[in-house]
């Protein structure tokens, strides 16, 4: 009767299946679980690692001699590694975040300063433009021709007199009623001798005045002659008194005697 090996007696179908599962199927499960844990830790860090469920190796019945404790790490190790990586990332990101916040605050201050200076510059430019426009308006108003003022009635009359008498106003010499009667008398006696130019030269008046005196047919009545005589006497006294005050009183003119002297003198020359 053949002898039975004690080693072979220990081999059975369950043990063979367990050993095959431990060496072939279990490593694949462990590798796939590790990959999923690494991916989830990169995406969701700590939160995702808690939600992932993996198959525990301890639940698989593996012989004590063939249990690969040294080859594959436990599922808790990736979470610890992820915690360490997140802590290191947080610790490394803190100085960077502080530097970024400092840069942001500095840039904000510079932006505020630049905005303030730009606002002040715009205000000063606006003020300068207003001053330039104001000075330009004042210059234009000063250089613009002023509208003519409405003239007073006396100014209009003065200009009309200047146009009428460019060399100055010199009223014509007024002849007394006696002088006008003497002119008419001389022209009536000797019209060929006492022509209009001759009479104008003798009485120092214009030829037009002599012509109008000779042409006039109007004769005053007795009352009008008396009134005219009185008026001329008053005028004579007023003028001569004023001239005597100034010391400029000339000789008393006598138009009647002058007319008689001229008439009889020329008659005597003619005889």
Curated annotation (Swiss-Prot):
It comes from Emericella nidulans (strain FGSC A4 / ATCC 38163 / CBS 112.46 / NRRL 194 / M139). Residues 79-99 have a biased composition (Low complexity). Its main location: mitochondrion. Required for respiratory activity and maintenance and expression of the mitochondrial genome. Keywords: Mitochondrion, Transit peptide. It comes from the Eukaryota. Belongs to the RRG9 family. PANTHER family: NEUGRIN (PTHR13475:SF3). Residues 57-177 are annotated as: Disordered. Coiled coil: none annotated. It is found in: Mitochondrion. GO terms for cellular component: mitochondrion; nucleus. Residues 1-59 form a transit peptide. This is Required for respiratory growth protein 9, mitochondrial. Residues 100-117 have a biased composition (Polar residues). Pfam families: Neugrin. The gene is rrg9. Residues 118-130 have a biased composition (Basic and acidic residues).
């Amino acid at each position: 009767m053949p002898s039975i090996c004690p080693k072979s007696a220990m081999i059975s179908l369950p043990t063979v299946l367990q050993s095959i599962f431990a060496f072939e199927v279990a490593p694949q499960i462990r590798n796939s679980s590790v990959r999923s844990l690494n991916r989830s830790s990169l995406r969701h860090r700590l939160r995702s690692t808690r939600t992932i469920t993996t198959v525990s190796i301890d639940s698989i019945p593996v012989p004590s001699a063939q249990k690969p404790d040294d080859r594959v790490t436990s599922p808790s190790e990736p979470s610890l590694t992820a915690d360490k990586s997140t802590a290191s990332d947080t610790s490394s990101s803190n100085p960077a975040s502080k530097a970024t916040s400092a840069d942001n605050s500095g840039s904000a201050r510079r932006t505020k300063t630049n905005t303030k200076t730009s606002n002040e510059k715009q205000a000063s430019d606006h003020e300068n433009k207003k001053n330039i426009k104001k000075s330009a308006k004042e210059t234009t108003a000063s250089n613009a021709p002023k509208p003519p003022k409405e003239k007073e009635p006396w100014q209009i009359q003065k200009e009309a007199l200047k146009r009428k008498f460019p060399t100055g106003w010199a009223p014509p010499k007024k002849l007394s009623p006696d002088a006008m009667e003497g002119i008419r008398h001389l022209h009536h006696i000797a019209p060929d001798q006492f022509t209009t130019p001759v009479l104008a030269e003798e009485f120092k008046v214009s030829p037009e005045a002599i012509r109008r005196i000779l042409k006039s047919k109007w004769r005053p009545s007795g009352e009008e002659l008396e009134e005219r005589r009185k008026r001329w006497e008053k005028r004579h006294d007023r003028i001569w008194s004023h001239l005597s005050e100034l010391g400029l009183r000339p000789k008393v003119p006598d138009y009647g005697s002058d007319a008689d002297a001229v008439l009889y003198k020329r008659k005597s020359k003619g005889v």
